[in-house]
Amino acid sequence: MGWRELAIWGAVAVAVANGLVGCYGAARWYRFAPSREFWLGVRAGQGLALAYAVLVAVLVLEHRHPSSSLYYLYALLPVAIGFVAEQLRLVAADQVLARDDLDDAQAVATLPAAEQQAIVTAILRREMGVMALAALVVCVLALRAAGTW
């Protein structure tokens, strides 16, 4: 397998992994069903995107260049998308608490158990939505990377 094939198949692997995770997460988000497997898949997809970015760096160091400079944008943006998605995920809890006029997590503890569970589920659902959407965006970018080598 040559450098070109390695770059293309690496991008396809990132696209498939993140596409599956994104679709699974979107389905679980729609059904209000938190999932441990989704979060493991998200982390695996992010790890694969990071490994692909390292491969791109190796290709640059080996003076193996794609046919289009856009390749670098499509190949490296998934790492940035993952970082931005994590930042948005961190804001999700604050948004849910603000929506329910709660100051902080300690204020949630004063609520009845059913309301606490509803707030936790709302936070998890919002986080899943953000990360599922990010995984789908990474999928599209990786497919574009494969097409621009």
Regions picked out by a protein language model, each given a short descriptive name:
Residues M1-W149:
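Polytopic transmembrane helical bundles with strong interfacial aromatic enrichment
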